From Swiss-Prot:
Residues 70-113 are annotated as: Disordered. This is Protein FAM178B. It comes from the Eukaryota. Belongs to the FAM178 family. InterPro entries: CANIN_dom, FAM178. Residues 75-90 have a biased composition (Low complexity). The lineage of its organism: Eukaryota, Metazoa, Chordata, Craniata, Vertebrata.
Length: 679
């Protein structure tokens, strides 16, 4: 055999390496310029390999550092060189795909970029990136570890390319490093470094399912909360021991306070439909064809005449308007607002025209009678006890037309407070116009009955929080029209004091009369004193006809207004024998006594404020201040368990301060010594 030369074994190996370089170069260029179908080979690569492509890797000579065969060992080069894209051999293929240069503005690869936030591997890659940046500087030992971490699919693929299994590791490393160098040469906005990110519809569907599950859990939790709120906790209540009960009663706060609004009375019952109003045209003679058509029409068409304004053309500016038409319009004031507004406007214009068209000496205007006013209130839903109360003006057992039709079946839908207030406002304004235009239209008995009726109906529960300006103006006019004034004052005060049995309602009734005229001031003072005497059972001790004795009478009644005396006065029913209910009954009795004392003290303040305090009455007012402080202020023992006591004591303090201010303004003049008096 021929002797083998020392370098003869290197030529075939170099040729094989050159072929492998050419093959890997083509593969790397193919990976760079491939479309969406050709990027499947780059998908299994790990993120660490791609991160290493961006850092220059210092390598030993692959031939020196990886080959242990004695024939493959040649002269070693001591210097290290970086592995870069320039060191890779140029491929010999004539059709070389164009690679995008780093300086180009637009990419040559227009394939859609991957949506990185849809891939769940992004967070894992971001956590692993800092540790993998140092792969390029660890030398051959790191490359061996890197080669050992390659996926098994990639190893199997490169082993199939070469039949010699023993050279799989060098070829694999060399192919990997050349591919990394080609990826490092790609620009930042190309496909390099993002091979692991791709659109994943399964992840979107999974996220949608998770959101649906969260919404279902939230719905179930809300249902459980509703079920917890609807549980009957009384079944789980355990009776407290005496020690626990005493502890709870010691630190419990009572919710019973003195209400700022009066409770009211049930006056207007609900009606489903208003009572029918029929125009009595039997005595009317038509003066025109249009009027004859109106009088002969059914009630529904007559209302259409009113809404269309034809009645204004027929009866406006006429000297003698039919009384039956005025009565029909007055009853229509109780209908819903869309009808009552037109009726009120026409009725007002007709009365005003009558005032200006008739001469002063022969002026006669139509005014609704007391009975017609009661019928109007009955049409609004007022029941008979409110219209015909037991008292000085009891009218017997007469039943108004349509009274039998008012039953419980018709009381289903309560009338709206606003609609009721609008109808009452129309009635108040029209009555005020009549009282102002013709003061002598009503007698004193009718005036007092009308005042009582207005005060009684105004205490309705639905009207408590609504303003009553029109009512107050009407009451002032009715008081001024009473001819026997001060003779009717005692009778009027006694009548009004029985309008309600509740002290707070009577206090609200006193406040219906504004403190504006001398008659209203005197009525407020006398009525307040009568209500105080009635609540204390001392009606016989009041000389109502003597105005100057009101402060002295109030001084005697103030001593009976202490809470302890009121508690004894209200304790007509003995406490229940059960000891468990005795503390509760005692607390309710204390609240009632303080509530009554609060109303009586408010009425006492009205009595004093309506007086014209003179220097002669300075001593009586000073005595009232002393009794207020002695019988009420010092008798109230505040407690966190009884807020009504605190409210009563606050009112007593405010009243005392107000009376002290009056004392400073009406203090009598001091008598000074004059040595020249007897000269």
């Amino acid at each position: 055999m021929w002797p083998r030369l020392p370098g003869a074994g290197l030529a075939p190996q170099l040729r094989r390496q050159d072929q492998r370089l050419h093959f890997t170069g083509q593969m790397s260029h193919g990976l760079q310029m491939a479309g969406p179908q050709e990027t499947v080979l780059a998908l299994p690569l790990r993120e660490g390999v791609q991160a290493a492509a961006t850092v220059p890797i210092l390598l030993y000579n692959l031939e020196d550092g990886l080959s242990d065969h004695p024939l493959d060992q040649g002269p070693r080069c001591p210097a290290r060189r970086p592995c870069s894209p320039a060191s890779a051999p140029a491929p010999t293929s004539p059709k070389k795909p164009k690679i995008q240069a780093p300086g180009e503005t637009f990419p040559t690869d227009w394939s859609p970029p991957p949506v990185e936030f849809l891939n769940p591997r992004v967070l894992q890659a971001s956590r692993e990136a800092p540790a993998q940046r140092w792969v390029g500087v660890v030398g051959p030992q790191g490359l061996r570890r890197l080669a050992g971490e390659l996926p098994e699919e990639l190893e199997q693929e490169h082993l199939d390319l070469d039949p010699k299994r023993g050279l799989a590791l060098p070829e694999k490393l060399f192919w990997n490093t050349s591919g990394l160098s080609q990826q490092a040469a790609a620009p930042e906005f190309s496909w390099g470094g993002s091979g692991s990110y791709f659109n994943n519809l399964d992840y979107l569907l999974q996220e949608k399912r998770e959101q649906a599950l969260e919404q279902e859990r939230e719905r179930l939790l809300l249902q459980e909360c509703l079920n917890l709120n609807s549980l009957d906790l009384d079944e789980e209540e355990v009776p407290l021991t005496p020690e626990h009960r005493m502890l709870v009663e010691k630190y419990s706060v009572s919710l019973q306070t003195i209400p700022p609004v009066h409770p009211g009375e049930t006056v207007f019952l609900p009606r489903c439909h208003p009572l029918p109003c029929i125009l009595d045209s039997s005595l009317l003679k038509p003066r025109s064809h249009l009027e004859g058509l109106f009088l002969s029409s059914p009630p529904a068409q007559q209302l259409s005449f009113l809404r269309s304004g034809l009645l204004n053309i027929l009866y406006l500016h006429m000297p003698d308007c039919p009384v039956s038409l005025l009565q029909w319009l007055f009853q229509l004031l109780t209908w819903p607002p869309e009808t009552s507004l037109g009726a009120f406007g026409l009725l007002w214009d007709l009365i005003v025209d009558g005032i200006f068209l008739q001469p002063d000496e022969d002026k006669h205007l139509w005014c609704p009678s007391l009975q017609e006013v009661r019928e109007a209130f009955h049409s609004l839903g007022a029941h008979s006890p409110a219209l015909y109360p037991l008292g000085p003006f009891w009218h017997g057992g007469r039943v108004l037309p349509g009274e039998a039709g008012l039953n419980e079946n018709e009381e289903q839908d309560a009338p709206q407070e606003i609609a009721l207030d609008i109808s009452l406002g129309h009635i108040y304004k029209f009555l005020a116009l009549c009282a102002q235009a013709q003061p002598g239209a009503y007698t004193d008995e009718n005036l007092m009955g009308l005042i009582e009726l207005l005060c009684r109906t105004s205490l309705d529960v639905g009207l408590r929080l609504l303003p009553k300006v029109d009512l107050q103006q009407l009451l002032l006019l009715l008081l001024e029209n009473i001819r026997e004034w001060p003779g009717k004052l005692q009778e009027l005060c006694c009548t009004l004091s029985w309008v309600s049995d509740h002290h707070h309602n009577l206090l609200a009734l006193v406040q219906f009369f504004p403190d504006m005229t001398s008659r209203s001031r005197r009525l407020r003072s006398q009525l307040s004193l009568v209500v105080i005497a009635r609540m204390l059972g001392q009606q016989e001790m009041l000389p109502l006809w003597q105005e100057k004795t009101q402060l002295s009478s109030l001084s005697r009644l103030l001593g009976l207004m202490r809470p302890s005396s009121l508690r004894q006065y209200l304790d007509s029913v003995p406490l229940p024998p059960c000891q468990e209910q005795q503390p509760k009954a005692s607390a309710e009795l204390d609240h009632k006594a303080c509530y009554l004392c609060h109303s009586l003290l408010m009425l006492a303040g009205v009595v004093v404020s309506c007086q014209d305090i003179t220097p002669d009455q300075w001593g009586e007012l000073q005595l009232l201040c002393m009794q207020l402080d002695r019988h009420i202020s010092t008798q109230i023992r505040e407690s966190p368990q009884a807020m009504h006591r605190t409210m009563l004591k606050d009112l007593a303090t405010q009243t005392y301060i107000r009376w002290q201010e009056l004392l400073t303004h009406c203090q009598p003049q001091a008598q000074y010594f004059s040595p020249w008096k007897d000269i």
